[in-house]
Amino acid sequence: MSEKSIVQEARDIQLAMELITLGARLQMLESETQLSRGRLIKLYKELRGSPPPKGMLPFSTDWFMTWEQNVHASMFCNAWQFLLKTGLCNGVDAVIKAYRLYLEQCPQAEEGPLLALTRAWTLVRFVESGLLQLSSCNCCGGNFITHAHQPVGSFACSLCQPPSRAVKRRKLSQNPADIIPQLLDEQRVQAV
């Protein structure tokens, strides 16, 4: 039986603390560290003040295909792939750094970010296993998450071709700078 390294255990505890702070679920912690389930639960309770949430991890690729989630997932995935390609980091460190970049760019709603860390980690696993990929939009040239084997040149992102329900959410003008004044005008008319 091999003896555990104290240095490796300290690294795992530090990594687990960072992941818990970012909102990781227990299954992600178990997969990325060598700490026991009992120690992870104890650490989670100590940092969060409550036990980790129960339940299964998201396992469907469909969540990443809906228009708003696709934009957020694509932003994260582009940052993650950039970090890997430049050799700045790899593995879970690349996921953490890409997720921090995503959080910097996307202001959080009260209920938290649209793309949670565990879902971002699941996205990485889907991309690495070949279930999802980044495809180039044939309109704007941006790279967006699509199902694997998307034919080249056949994809238009949800920013270039928003679904009708996205347009109903807010009336878009030809000039994006006009959106806020339009909303203010509508509110004034309704008030009168």
Swiss-Prot record:
Cofactor note: Binds 1 zinc ion per subunit.
TM annotation in the entry: none
Residues that, per the record, bind Zn(2+): 137, 140, 157, 160
This protein's UniProt keywords: Activator, Bacterial flagellum biogenesis, Cytoplasm, DNA-binding, Metal-binding, Nucleotide-binding, Phosphoprotein, Transcription, Transcription regulation, Zinc
Family: Belongs to the FlhC family.
Listed GO biological process terms: bacterial-type flagellum organization; DNA-templated transcription; positive regulation of bacterial-type flagellum assembly; positive regulation of DNA-templated transcription
Pfam families the record matches: FlhC (PF05280)
Cystine crosslinks: none
Co-factor(s): Zn(2+)
One cellular-component annotation, GO: transcription regulator complex
Annotated positions of the O-UMP-serine modification: 31
Post-translational modification (record): Can be UMPylated on Ser-31 by SelO/YdiU.
GO MF term set: DNA binding; zinc ion binding
Subunit structure: Heterohexamer composed of two FlhC and four FlhD subunits. Each FlhC binds a FlhD dimer, forming a heterotrimer, and a hexamer assembles by dimerization of two heterotrimers.
Gene transcribed to yield this protein: flhC
Organism field: Escherichia coli (strain K12)
Record's note on what induces expression: Expression is regulated by a large number of systems, including induction by quorum sensing via the two-component regulatory system QseB/QseC, induction by cAMP-CRP, repression by high osmolarity via OmpR and repression by H-NS.
Task performed by this protein: Functions in complex with FlhD as a master transcriptional regulator that regulates transcription of several flagellar and non-flagellar operons by binding to their promoter region. Activates expression of class 2 flagellar genes, including fliA, which is a flagellum-specific sigma factor that turns on the class 3 genes. Also regulates genes whose products function in a variety of physiological pathways.
Chief subcellular location: cytoplasm
UniProt cross-references to HAMAP family, sorted A to Z: FhlC (MF_01891)
Compartments, as annotated in UniProt: Cytoplasm
InterPro entries xrefs: FlhC
Activity regulation statement: UMPylation of FlhC by SelO/YdiU inhibits its DNA-binding activity, which inhibits the expression of class II and class III flagellar genes, and interrupts flagellar synthesis.
Protein name: Flagellar transcriptional regulator FlhC
